[in-house]
């Protein structure tokens, strides 16, 4: 059975997305990238950009399930901004009536590298290896989103 998995790495400045297609043990990379919002733009407008662009990603790829990274931050100010963006993401996913799976950063690192405290490069190398990419996926937020999607596939 073919299944499309959309991985999301929520952020206000840059929201990463990655779409993979799976069929039994076969895996195909369909698309990855970021939804970017201008830093000096009003917060309401930035959230609107995320809202509209995420709808476009969902309409283009029609995923069967969405895997999203759970919120985990060190700086309080940044956490609040990301939480606002994450709220918009969850609203859009609810509007599309999509099942959502959430993973912590440690769960994602463990699934991809076998080590829950792996660094970003180790995770990106694992993503590149699993998807047979010639180079590490960029930007970082898109690579993180692909890692989330792969985690959902591994946990099936």
From Swiss-Prot:
Co-factor requirement: Mg(2+)
CDD domains linked: RuvC
Cofactor note: Binds 2 Mg(2+) ion per subunit.
Active site: 9, 69, 141
Keywords associated with the record: Cytoplasm, DNA damage, DNA recombination, DNA repair, DNA-binding, Endonuclease, Hydrolase, Magnesium, Metal-binding, Nuclease
Binding-site residues for Mg(2+) 1, renumbered to this chain: 9, 141
Its EC number(s): 3.1.21.10
Source species, domain of life: Bacteria
Compartment(s): Cytoplasm
Enzyme class: hydrolase
One cellular component term from this protein's GO annotations in UniProt: cytoplasm
Recorded catalytic activity of this chain's protein: Endonucleolytic cleavage at a junction such as a reciprocal single-stranded crossover between two homologous DNA duplexes (Holliday junction)
Residues annotated as binding Mg(2+) 2: 69
BP terms from Gene Ontology: DNA recombination; DNA repair
Gene Ontology MF terms in the entry: crossover junction DNA endonuclease activity; DNA binding; magnesium ion binding
Subunit structure as annotated in this protein's UniProt entry: Homodimer which binds Holliday junction (HJ) DNA. The HJ becomes 2-fold symmetrical on binding to RuvC with unstacked arms; it has a different conformation from HJ DNA in complex with RuvA. In the full resolvosome a probable DNA-RuvA(4)-RuvB(12)-RuvC(2) complex forms which resolves the HJ.
Main function: The RuvA-RuvB-RuvC complex processes Holliday junction (HJ) DNA during genetic recombination and DNA repair. Endonuclease that resolves HJ intermediates. Cleaves cruciform DNA by making single-stranded nicks across the HJ at symmetrical positions within the homologous arms, yielding a 5'-phosphate and a 3'-hydroxyl group; requires a central core of homology in the junction. The consensus cleavage sequence is 5'-(A/T)TT(C/G)-3'. Cleavage occurs on the 3'-side of the TT dinucleotide at the point of strand exchange.
HAMAP family, sorted: RuvC
Annotated protein name in UniProt: Crossover junction endodeoxyribonuclease RuvC
Annotated organism of origin: Acaryochloris marina (strain MBIC 11017)
Taxonomic lineage: Bacteria, Bacillati, Cyanobacteriota, Cyanophyceae, Acaryochloridales
Encoding gene (name): ruvC
